[in-house]
Design a protein with these regions (language model features):
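Amphipathic alpha-helical binding modules
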Residues: 443-474
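Surface-exposed intrinsically disordered loops and tails
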Residues: 431-448
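Short loop/beta submotifs within extracellular cysteine-rich repeat domains
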Residues: 374, 388-389, 420-428, 458-462
């Protein structure tokens, strides 16, 4: 709607000199209409040398050339944008960015020569990122759905999760989820967990959407040992989240939602292995209180713009994570390697259990057949692989399935099963035996394999081992 309103204003401004000229010549001066129209059109081309008979014609004579010049500039700019877009489209990795706000400029700057500034019209590109207000993104996608049918589209949405998309090339994303994934990747808890014998306490001050994503992602990637106990303590809301995600209670790592204020539990806040202060109202004041009340030397702060203008940003005890800026990093938003790993897992399963040939074409075909839940399950498995690689590096072992000791492979397979169970628990699945003899019932959300690794059949254990082998083979 806004696009058509802007276009209408431009047309009205362009026609303003014509209207003034017609009023001055045809109405006030009484000249024939066709003659008046001809002379008015000439004004746009600087072809009016007579003395204006009245003020209307005088205004038209001066504004018509300005209108012509402005449209020439606009046409040149549009032509330049289209030509640049086509030139960048010749690159196999071109990405068009549409939307509003600082995220557009941030993405285009990081994309460099492969970035295409979308503007109002649909320009050719190999992939598309839609940022800004969700309603406008959805409207733009619906308007161009036919042209985008075979293009990967990343659409920013606050209310819709990736599970809401039935189209394999349409991915809903939120900045908070991207930031959470990147934070746990960069923070790397494995070494800390080893030093603490895998007994950790993580405290979150503040919650909201960012806290939800940090917790969900952390429970799926911070898996280092079968007998670990990583506690997550939440201060600052979470009642709705706790009530909806009933499956969290089935996860071995405790999640505690505190109703009392954080400053009544200074012992826990001071001694926690990791303290995350999420962006919230009056965050600088909270940080001042925190630094005064505790002797902590390390605090991870998810900072927005308000903190950047305070001296607190320079405090060595605060590890600033500019989450809004990092959330739009192309590598984390597009992440080709993550998707390649997820598709490789799915294709291997299709080959082993469906006799599907492992070809590049079948990789895409089989991926497109997946329901959103299974698709995201494979992505979760691929995402955890980064932790697995860090563990192997710390143990001094090669990231090779052929060179992996059997005992290590078994450990990694058990950890993978724990992650798989957690993914299902976080979506409120429970153990159960479907009546038709199958392993799972998606409607009732029950699965026969939601049991400890030791209780699995050898065939089911082999699936977890094969998952490790597949991912270690993907570069």
């Amino acid at each position: 709607m806004e696009k058509y309103t802007t276009r209408g204003r431009k047309i009205l401004l362009f026609c303003f000199p014509l209207a003034c000229g017609l009023i001055g010549l045809a109405v006030v001066a009484g000249e024939p209409l066709l003659d008046s129209l001809y002379r008015c059109i000439g004004m746009y081309l600087l072809d009016y040398g007579d003395t204006p008979p009245n003020l209307w014609v005088e205004v038209a004579r001066w504004t018509a050339p300005l209108a012509t010049a402005s449209w020439v500039v606009l046409a040149f700019g549009a032509l330049r944008r289209v030509l640049c877009g086509w030139l960048r489209y010749l690159r196999a990795d071109s990405v068009a960015v549409y939307g509003q706000g600082p995220a557009v400029a941030l993405l285009l700057d990081q994309l460099g020569n492969r970035g295409v500034a979308g503007g109002q019209s649909l320009l050719p590109a190999h992939r598309y990122i839609l940022v800004g207000p969700e309603e406008k993104n959805l409207s733009f996608y619906r308007e161009h759905q036919r042209e985008l049918a075979d293009k990967p589209v990343y659409l920013q949405s606050h209310s819709l999760s990736p599970l809401a998309s039935n189209h394999p090339l349409l991915k809903f994303f939120c900045p908070e989820a991207n930031a959470a994934r990147l934070f746990w990747q960069k923070r790397g808890l494995y070494q800390i967990s080893c030093r603490k014998k895998h007994q950790l306490q993580i405290v979150l001050l503040g919650f909201g959407r960012l806290g939800e994503e940090l917790l969900l992602r952390g429970l799926q990637v911070n898996i280092f040992a079968p007998d670990q106990c990583i506690q997550y303590h939440i201060f600052g809301g979470g009642e709705r989240f706790e009530a909806i995600h009933t499956g969290i209670a089935r996860i071995e790592d405790p999640v505690v939602f505190h109703r009392e204020p954080w400053y009544t539990r200074l012992d826990l806040v001071d001694q926690a292995d990791l303290l995350l202060v999420l962006e919230q109202e009056d965050q600088p004041h909270l940080l001042e209180d925190l630094l005064l009340a505790t002797t902590r030397q390390t605090v991870d702060v998810f900072a927005g713009g308000a903190l950047a203008i305070t001296p607190l940003e320079q405090d060595p005890r605060l590890h600033i994570f500019p989450w809004e800026q990092r959330a739009y990093t192309p590598e984390i938003l597009l992440d080709d390697l993550l998707l390649a790993r997820a598709k490789a897992i799915n294709l291997r399963y299709s080959h082993l259990y469906g006799k599907v040939a492992e070809t590049a074409e079948n990789r895409e075909t089989e991926w497109a057949r997946l329901d959103p839940f299974t698709r995201e399950s494979n992505i979760s498995a691929a995402d955890y692989h980064q932790v697995r690689l860090e563990m192997l590096a710390a143990l001094g072992l090669p990231a090779s399935a052929q060179a992996l000791p059997g005992q290590t492979l078994e450990l990694l397979a058990e950890l993978e099963h724990i992650r798989w169970c957690r993914y299902h628990y976080l979506h409120n699945w429970v153990w159960g035996q479907p009546e038709d003899g199958k392993r799972k019932d998606p409607v009732r959300r029950i699965h026969a394999d939601l049991v400890p690794y030791g209780q699995l059949t050898e065939a089911e254990k082999e699936k977890d081992r094969e998952n490790i082998r597949i991912l270690l083979s993907v570069e």
